């Protein structure tokens, strides 16, 4: 995937109830969403932008040298927001691959962002995502931890069969913690947003099931650990401690290069 053909989009909203204003919370002098943006830039994949329906988020991103695109407020999922942003940023269709990166991963390693592209080297794959092996019963039984169930197709790679909040699969063997980072082929993203919400998507509250129920192929790259998301005040303090000792990446791929 070349830089000019790959776009990283970070959907960000002010809708969090446990941490109000989450994208703009300060971590070491920068808003959280700017940390995510800069780590995506450091991955060296290509152009990076924040997709938001909130003027305050857009203003904060641009004030720190990043790129933001305003989107509608009524999208049913982050993927729908990403598709609108793609269409507005690249109306001529030059971008071939889109990465959807959650805006609450301020400590994510750039190499993990690059890893999500690897399954798309197989032309049969529509969407790629990540997972890490689960090592505790607490994690395996936690409904807030989404489990990825799949069949091995290559070393450290699965073909997704299902995603669930339940403990799965049953019995002995590895279980995997799904990581909410996606890479889409452009046509696959368009097909996904054109599909209606599916029954299992509604039941599990997992939008990726819409793709599986629609007959799309999702492959999962296995990585060593789960990036630390920020959902609670305790998570925020942990991120602040981690980033206090880590240099802040500089923006590396200016918006004019697309």
UniProtKB/Swiss-Prot annotation:
InterPro entries, sorted: Cytidylyl_trans, KdsB, Nucleotide-diphossugar_trans
Gene: kdsB
Residues in the signal sequence: none
Recorded family membership: Belongs to the KdsB family.
Keyword field: Cytoplasm, Lipopolysaccharide biosynthesis, Nucleotidyltransferase, Transferase
Pathway: Nucleotide-sugar biosynthesis; CMP-3-deoxy-D-manno-octulosonate biosynthesis; CMP-3-deoxy-D-manno-octulosonate from 3-deoxy-D-manno-octulosonate and CTP: step 1/1; Bacterial outer membrane biogenesis; lipopolysaccharide biosynthesis
EC number(s) per entry: 2.7.7.38
Record's protein name: 3-deoxy-manno-octulosonate cytidylyltransferase
Keyword tRNA processing tagged: no
Location of the protein in the cell: Cytoplasm
Species assigned in the record: Nitrobacter hamburgensis (strain DSM 10229 / NCIMB 13809 / X14)
């Amino acid at each position: 995937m070349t830089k000019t053909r790959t776009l990283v989009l970070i959907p960000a909203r002010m809708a969090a109830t446990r941490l109000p204003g989450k994208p703009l919370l300060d971590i070491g002098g920068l808003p959280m969403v700017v940390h995510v943006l800069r780590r995506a830039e450091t991955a060296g994949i290509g152009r990076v932008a924040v997709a938001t329906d909130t003027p305050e988020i857009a203003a904060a991103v641009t004030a720190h040298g990043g790129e933001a695109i305003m989107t509608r407020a009524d999208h049913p999922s982050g993927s729908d927001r990403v598709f609108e942003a793609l269409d507005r940023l690249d109306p001529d269709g030059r971008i071939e691959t889109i990465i959807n990166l959650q805006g609450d991963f301020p400590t994510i390693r750039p190499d993990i962002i690059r890893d999500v592209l690897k399954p798309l080297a197989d032309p049969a794959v529509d969407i790629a995502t990540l997972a890490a092996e689960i090592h505790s019963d607490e994690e395996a039984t936690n409904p807030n931890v989404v489990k990825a169930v799949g069949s091995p197709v290559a070393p450290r790679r699965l073909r997704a069969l299902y995603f669930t909040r339940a403990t799965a699969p049953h019995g002995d063997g590895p279980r995997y913690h799904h990581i909410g980072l996606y890479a889409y082929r452009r046509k696959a993203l368009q097909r996904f947003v054109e599909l209606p919400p599916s029954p299992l998507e509604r039941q599990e509250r997992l939008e990726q099931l819409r793709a599986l129920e629609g007959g799309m192929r999702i492959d999962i790259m296995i990585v060593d650990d789960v990036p630390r998301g920020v959902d609670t005040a305790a998570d925020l303090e942990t991120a602040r401690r981690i980033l206090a000792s880590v240099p802040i990446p500089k923006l590396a791929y200016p918006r004019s290069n697309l």
